[in-house]
Amino acid sequence: MHLGHAYAALFAWRAARTVGGRFQIRIEDIDKGRCRPAFADAIVEDLDWLGLDWDGPVMRQSDNLADYGRAIERLEALDVLYPCFCTRSEIRAEIARADAAPHGPDGALYPGTCRVLSRDQRRARIALGRPFALRLNMDKAMALAGPLDWHDRALGRQPCDPAGAGDVVVARKDTPTSYHLAVCVDDHRQ
């Protein structure tokens, strides 16, 4: 854990304890390529060394894959997911070709190449064994959800526009969930 993470944990712990709230630990370990159990264990040891206590057991995302699967099933039932067969390099090339590619806060957004594929085209690619990720059709999802907001204790009602993130990936071929989906499910649970 680096100093910034330690500071954030101390700040969150103090804020929770000051108002009688709960301080919970969640290990976001779904990326098996970068996450190691030893890293997670070291984080817990560091928090303990800092003298922090937490409410409930340490939650590990890798223990909750079934919950994320149920969330994907629900999104599929709402017809807001679609398979995306594009590789990262294909997406970069498509964005480079577009003069005015849409951009979010973290750079260019997915251009929606596979969003416009027909059901037959999607089925044919899947039948050929083409790997794919599942993306959230943000336009459809926002039409179902309507305006979104959240409450900040200091600033009051704050509008939220997830459409700025574009059609996010909710599951990949190598991981049954994505960060975007997992943190939403976990935030709701916690």
PLM feature spans:
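Active-site cores that bind ATP or allylic diphosphates and position pyrophosphate for catalysis
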Residues: 89-190
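N-terminal Rossmann-like or analogous alpha/beta NTP/dinucleotide-binding catalytic cores
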Residues: 1-102, 188
